[in-house]
Amino acid sequence: MLQPSAQGSYSKAVLSTFRSLEDLTCDGSKIILDGQSLNVSSVVAAACHQVPASISKDPQLHARLRESVELLARKLAEGEIVYGVNTGFGGSADTRTDDYSTLQQALVQHQASGVLLPTDRSSSRPSSRYPHGLRSHSMPTAVVKAAMLVRCNSLLRGHSAVRPEVIEHILAFLRSGLIPVVPVRGSISASGDLSPLSYIANALEGNPDIAIQNEATGDVIRADEALQQLGLAPLRFGPKEGLGLLNGTAFSAGAASLVLFEANQLVLLSQVLTAMGTEALAGSTGNYHPFIAGVRPHRGQIEAAGNIFHFLRDSRMATSPGADGASHSSSLAQDRYALRTASQWIGPQIEDMSLASEQVHCELNSTTDNPLLDPGSGHMHHGGNFQATSITSAMEKTMSAMQMLGRMIFSQCTELINPALNNGLPPNLSFDDPSLSFTMKGIDINMSAYMAELSYLNHHVSNHVQSAEMHNQGLNSLALVASRYAAETVEVLSLMASAYLYALCQALDLRACHLEFLRNARSTVDSLTAELCLSFSPLLSESDQRQIQDSTWEQLLHHWNRSSTSDLHDRSRNAASHTMGALVELLPMQLNEATALPTRLAPQQQWLDEVSATLAGSYDATRAKFQSNPTTPFYLCSASRRMYEFVRKGLGVPLHRGIVDHPTYPSVTEEHAGQELIGSQVSKIYMALRGGVFRDVLQDCWYSSDSVRGFAGEELVLASKL
């Protein structure tokens, strides 16, 4: 028999990055750069958590740096033509000069041509004279920091003839939180990210027109003032150092690393959300059975199915194939596609994101300059390692994965909110009567807006390449543009995931309350049905009576679910009335034919009245008790329970009780004071997701479910790359 495969390398690798980041952010941790071992976790640690970086003391590394500088000096002494050192740049490389230092200044001068707003270059607030609200034109600080780290690591490989002190200057800025203000647009990532990197090079020169932001205080000073604060002298570049600083993919690779870290988190979260959705909709665990994935053995599908199947193994809400109540003649024989094909949908995204992770890791530890110096052979090579197409490829896969996961979440969420599809849950997931409460209707609309925007963003940037720079750069990767738009897809999918998680917690509460209601009401309804049976046939056998009770309850539950759009009193009456007809057909008519019609109808009317009252009273009592003592965790699988309790307890996002939770609703009790908007509650989830707070609970979901069996002690190649 095929066994569940929850040992997927992708999940392990992503979880490994979480642990790696935790280790790096411990007090006293430091990133050691050696040109060989930089990973995404280290980039995130430096860019987002102020973890300092320094150069390895490995003597071989320092020897490589020295030898590359010496090799270039020999080539120039021998009169060799070296692009960008004694020639012009790009389509102007037909010029020659021996004024090497001035040529490097000319390079950083002409590339610093991007647009920044006055407010980007100062500590002041945006001016009101721009009525349309100009948003910042500067690169996010975290991206600039990531680029600084990545460029240092690449230069340490010793193929660019850049002195160690140049690299140390960059790291001094980075460690002190003095970050150049860099335009967000202007790079085509062809000969690397020339324009944005030129702002870092200009900062090292002490250019007074370069703005430097103090990350700790928000103050903005000039680059020459920043050098004075650091106790550093302005640099005068060696023959190839300006080119070595600019001619690389650091901004693309740095931005891609930050995007990838969050995107991978969302891929894991989508699997937990699918498990929660399966429970909320009373779906089938059979959707994710290992046999299904095993006979179509795509690696990603096997991993996704294995994870979700393991998550659900201890659920009391999801149904199992062949279990009592798993299906009814009146319900769909199988779940709709949003759940049933989730593993087939997530699987290819896992495969794409695995490859994207490998591509970005490789780029972080690559030499992306031109020309390249090989001290070992004494040769120099003119080529195109600055073309960042691998990053473009990784980011376009990421954009596609985010859109595909968004489409799945959108389908699951809209099914959850729609009473025609959600298997008996109230419309709009309202906790109170639906005539005056429309809880998730706004989120339903929000999700449509998010989905439309996410789909718009998912267009291959590489389709829009334009020839540049005298047609010398006829091909250019647009990798930084791709990274920027991939970041947008991560943002929008994070909004969708947050809204969906809010709706899921509400739905799980409603489902649990429903199960409590069924448990409380069943015995009374069975007693009333038994009394009705005996009034028609005093000699009815116990087994026949039980059969009638079971059939009646099933019919009653069916009509209860179908009338979820009605307020409680009407819903109870409708369910009982529609069930009455089926019950009459089941009753053994053994009364004397001479018995008067009113006499025969009286027991039926009594049953109808009492069952209606029982349903309404039981549901109302259950609902009231549930508010103060929710039993939802009891029914959930381990993974769902941890995510649910994280939202409810960790983030303080409560069950939405309906109109009484509106902040301005008239209330006579203090318990209703301080209520928040639905959007404010979703915002708590969103900020926690974007702030990295979800990493711990995601790890708990995997470890608590034992979904990644054999994880401890097993090192994966992919994990080290992430």
UniProtKB/Swiss-Prot annotation:
(E)-cinnamate binds at residues 247, 334, 340, 370, 441, 469, 472. GO terms for molecular function: ammonia-lyase activity. One of its GO terms (cellular component) is cytoplasm. Keywords: Alkaloid metabolism, Lyase. Contains an active site 4-methylidene-imidazol-5-one (MIO), which is formed autocatalytically by cyclization and dehydration of residues Ala-Ser-Gly. InterPro entries: Aromatic_Lyase, Fumarase/histidase_N, L-Aspartase-like, Phe/His_NH3-lyase_AS, Phe_NH3-lyase, Phe_NH3-lyase_shielding_dom_sf. Pfam families: Lyase_aromatic. This is Phenylalanine ammonia-lyase lenB.
